[in-house]
């Protein structure tokens, strides 16, 4: 992802507090200080051991639901069972729906109870990341939860959401976050 998905953004995530009762636009000096601890250069892997430089922390929120969905899908597959797993923006279609593909709707960011598209899938995951569910507004500016590890601010682009279809929900999570 060339750093676009960076699990070391935990200090920034905590600083912004988006989705919590403490959400705020942090002071630039606080963002600058947090950025000193962000980046995979602060992660050192040796065999089964992972060490972080001082102040660095890991936030697996960008892939945790995908990991959980994959584990649940494996349980269903091992039991030779069909089912639809829905974990927020992570949907895993295991097998078929009475012999037919599962029809998965992609939510409309402007009207989340409506859909903008539908895909027919089986044994695949459909993962959507977007800036339209976890955000706050301050002084007329909208701040969402997907943070840019280079700037320390929410990603700025013209996208409201990205959906990825693949055989791994964890991979879909990482890719959809990266593409945002």
Language-model segment annotations:
Residues 1-180:
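Mature catalytic core of soluble alpha/beta enzymes
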């Amino acid at each position: 992802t060339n750093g676009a998905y960076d699990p070391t953004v935990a200090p920034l995530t905590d600083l912004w507090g988006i989705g919590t009762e403490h959400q705020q636009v942090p002071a630039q000096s606080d963002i600058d200080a947090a950025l000193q601890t962000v980046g995979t250069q602060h992660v050192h892997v040796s065999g089964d051991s992972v060490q972080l430089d001082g102040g660095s922390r890991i936030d697996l929120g960008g892939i945790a639901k995908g990991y959980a969905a994959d584990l649940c899908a494996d349980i269903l597959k091992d039991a030779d069972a069909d089912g639809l797993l829905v974990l927020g923006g992570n949907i895993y279609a295991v097998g078929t729906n009475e012999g037919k593909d599962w029809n998965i709707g992609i939510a409309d960011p402007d009207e989340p109870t409506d859909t903008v598209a539908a895909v027919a899938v089986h044994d695949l995951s459909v993962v959507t990341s977007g800036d339209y569910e976890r955000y706050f507004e301050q002084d007329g500016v909208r701040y969402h939860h997907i943070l840019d590890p280079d700037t320390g601010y929410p990603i700025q682009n013209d996208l409201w959401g990205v959906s990825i279809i693949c055989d791994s929900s964890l991979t879909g999570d990482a890719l959809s976050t990266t593409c945002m």
